[in-house]
Every structure is written in structure tokens, then in C-alpha cells.
Regions:
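Alpha-helical transmembrane bundles and membrane-interface segments of multipass inner-membrane proteins
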Residues: 1-165
């Protein structure tokens, strides 16, 4: 439940902020503080605009990854892991929605809306924050809650059985 709630919440936050960016930043840049500004861009590639000619393949790959994460999401044992996977899935889906439906050229031909600009880092969006921070949290969750080793539990069972005889 937590995994799904985080994923849905992240998609909604991402799409609402992109809606705001598209409606408010068409011909404008808003300086927020220091080097942070909001500036509307469309990214037809992956991270850092790499692979701009492969938008359809990037979209298909993202859908496959989301499918795998949703499948694995049901078996997550920790709350932190559930939040992390929810952020990754929500972020990936937010960007896939842009690719799928923000295009005049056809399905999965659209560009991802990016608008958060620090001027010293590539422009990004809320979905990107979910994917990156979710991945970091997933690593932390994995380090804090390692999967039990099947050979360890089998070894404990057999040694306790041997000791009791």
C-alpha cells in the first residue's frame, strides 16, 4: 500500500508541477533564489539529454523497468524500501507520461518537461528527483536491511538439528 501511495503521489506532484510550468513559463524565466530559476525546456533524450534520437526506445525501456519494479514492489520488506521504489516508479511514470502524451509526432515521441534550473546543473523536474533520490534511498534500504542468505538459514537449521541429536 505504501509503495503504491508514494508512486501515485509522486506522479501527481510531477504532473501538477509540469502543468504549472507549461502554463506559466512559456516565454518567461522566473528567478527564485541565488542560481535557482524556473525555465521551461523539453528533453527528447534521457538524463542530461543523452540519446535525443532514441525517445521511443527510452520510453519502452522505462516502461519495462517500471513493470519490473511494480512486480518487485509487492515483496519489499521495509518501509524505506517501499518509499524508495514508489519514488522511482512514480518518477519514471511521470516522465513516460510526458513522452507518451506531450507530442504532436505520435505515441512516445514527446519530450519530457524540465523546468528546475540551477544554471550549473542540467535542468530537471520532480520526476527526476524521485528517480535519483529513490535510487539513493533504495541503496540505503538495501544496506540497512540485507536479504537473508538462503545458505545461512539452511546452515542454521542443519546445525541446530545436528546439535540436538
Amino acid at each position: 500500500v505504501l509503495f503504491g501511495a508514494v508512486a501515485v503521489g509522486w506522479v501527481l506532484a510531477d504532473q501538477l508541477t509540469k502543468w504549472w510550468a507549461v502554463s506559466s513559463l512559456q516565454d518567461d524565466t522566473i528567478d527564485v533564489v541565488w542560481t535557482l530559476r524556473f525555465q521551461l525546456l523539453k528533453n527528447y533524450g534521457a538524463s542530461f539529454s543523452l540519446g535525443a534520437g532514441y525517445g521511443v526506445w527510452i520510453g519502452i525501456l522505462a516502461l519495462v523497468v517500471v513493470g519490473i519494479l511494480v512486480w518487485k514492489g509487492g515483496s519489499v520488506r521495509s518501509r524505506l524500501g517501499a518509499v524508495a521504489l514508489g519514488m522511482i516508479v512514480g518518477g519514471a511514470l511521470g516522465n513516460v507520461l510526458d513522452r507518451a502524451f506531450r507530442s504532436d509526432s505520435g505515441f512516445l515521441q514527446g519530450g519530457v518537461i524540465d523546468f528546475i534550473d540551477f544554471q550549473w546543473w542540467p535542468v530537471f523536474n520532480i520526476a527526476d528527483i524521485g528517480v535519483v533520490c529513490g535510487a539513493i534511498l533504495l541503496v540505503i534500504s538495501t544496506l540497512l536491511n540485507p536479504e537473508p542468505d538462503a545458505s545461512d538459514s539452511a546452515g542454521e537449521t542443519s546445525s541446530s538439528t545436528i546439535e540436538s541429536n
